[in-house]
């Protein structure tokens, strides 16, 4: 394949560049920001995302930047354990998750892309139109508008994807819950801890060096009102009356400006391709964060797409095969994440029914681990066996 254009220099776009550099002779990476950066606080890399980084030769670097996570607990508002899950062991360094700052992961991926001589970066350029024939129109901050032609255009430009919105995709975007997230100076448990309350979820994970990542739901009216007023003391008070542990971390936030506030959106597309245009990551399948599969799924998308492109079929057939393989599987993940997002915010008496049902899993701890293993195993196997990495990168 001669030329591939990737729109978006976030985690999914950078990963796509790295993987597709084993397929394309030359690539163009388009990003609207003049200095690309990753929006967000932190994430947990799971086995399916980590195996992609391993195949790219970046896993050890990422592991060194993050913290090893071996289990997660879910508790109710009374701190009663609802579910404990040990991270499943897939061998070869994939027996844990890694909590890492998004900026650190982004920096590592960006440096790796800079080492690919065939990738031309067009930072400060906004996609204003895309056509299924493989043409993309961009407008750059330096002035002027131009059209790029490619054998394949990859839309990795997030939930508000310009490729998706202008490229003839039949899609639906629906709003979900809102969250406040940040990183603070604090010591927390060495595992991922999440609480389910009537306000929604609160959770935290260690990042090392005395830092912790945490999030609080901001969807329920008392919290939403405080966020709308940008009133940090009021948000602390709301959570203190519900879950003092959450308020304890919120008090370590210096100002409201240190919080990242976002409303999670779900993206559903009838297909992830339109001619020579194809979507990956949030552009294709943004979802609730409750399974932590956003970035992990995007990494797998890139490999599955590239694997079809090296199979000897046309670009059009390759993206259709990618769609048939990935879209149904990811739809199931989206659905489960959405259900969990609703379950975690139940109030009485439904919360008591939920807690009683989940209590069964605490009697058989392997249930949570086995479910996680079954969910991730197909991705891990697909990436490990991918032949695209046998091709020399450009």
Residue ranges and their predicted role:
Residues 5-22, 30, 155, 258-345:
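Conserved mid-domain beta->alpha element of the FAD-binding
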Residues 21-41:
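Glycine-rich FAD pyrophosphate-binding loop
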Residues 192-224, 236-243:
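Active-site substrate-recognition segment that forms the wall
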Residues 1-4, 21, 46-167, 172-185, ...:
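Conserved N-terminal helical subregion
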Residues 5, 28, 120, 213-215:
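A structural signal for isolated positions on well-ordered beta-strands in alpha/beta enzyme cores
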Residues 12, 35, 160:
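Conserved Rossmann-like nucleotide-cofactor binding loop
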Residues 226-258, 315, 323-324, 365:
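Flavin-binding catalytic cores
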Residues 2, 64, 291, 307-394:
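C-terminal helical "tail/cap" subdomain of flavin- and related membrane-associated enzymes
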């Amino acid at each position: 394949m001669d030329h591939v254009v990737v729109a978006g220099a976030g985690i999914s776009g950078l990963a796509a560049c790295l993987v597709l550099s084993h397929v394309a002779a030359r690539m163009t990476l388009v990003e609207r920001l003049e200095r690309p950066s990753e929006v967000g606080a932190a994430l947990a890399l799971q086995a399916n995302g980590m195996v992609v980084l391993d195949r790219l030769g970046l896993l050890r670097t990422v592991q060194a930047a993050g913290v090893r996570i071996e289990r997660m607990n879910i508790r109710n508002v009374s701190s009663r354990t609802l579910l404990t899950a040990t991270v499943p062991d897939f061998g070869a360094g994939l027996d844990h998750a890694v909590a890492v700052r998004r900026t650190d992961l982004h920096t590592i991926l960006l440096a790796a892309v800079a080492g690919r001589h065939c990738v031309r970066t067009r930072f400060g350029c906004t996609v204003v139109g895309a056509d299924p024939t493989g043409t993309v129109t961009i407008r750059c901050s330096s002035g002027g508008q131009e059209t790029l032609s490619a054998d394949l255009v990859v839309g990795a430009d997030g939930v508000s994807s310009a490729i998706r919105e202008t490229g003839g995709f039949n899609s639906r975007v629906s709003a979900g819950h809102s969250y406040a997230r940040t990183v603070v100076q604090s010591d927390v448990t060495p595992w991922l801890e999440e609480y389910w309350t009537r306000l929604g979820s609160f959770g935290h994970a260690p990042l090392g060096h005395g830092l912790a990542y945490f999030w609080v739901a901001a969807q329920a009216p008392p919290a939403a009102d405080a966020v709308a007023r940008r009133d940090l003391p009021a948000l602390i008070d709301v959570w203190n009356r519900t879950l003092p542990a959450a308020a304890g971390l919120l008090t370590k936030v210096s100002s409201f400006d240190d919080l990242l506030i976002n409303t999670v959106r779900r993206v559903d597309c009838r297909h992830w391709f339109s001619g020579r245009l194809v979507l990956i990551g949030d552009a294709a399948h943004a979802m609730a964060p409750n399974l932590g599969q956003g970035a992990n799924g995007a990494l797998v998308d890139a490999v599955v797409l590239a694997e079809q492109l090296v199979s000897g079929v046309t670009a059009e057939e390759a993206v259709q095969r990618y769609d048939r393989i990935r879209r149904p599987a990811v739809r199931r993940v989206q659905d489960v994440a959405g259900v969990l997002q609703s379950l975690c915010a139940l109030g009485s008496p439904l919360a008591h029914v939920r807690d009683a049902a989940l209590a069964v899993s605490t009697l058989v701890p392997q249930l949570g681990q086995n479910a996680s293993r079954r969910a991730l195993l197909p991705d891990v196997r697909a990436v490990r066996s991918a032949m695209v990495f046998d091709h020399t990168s450009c």
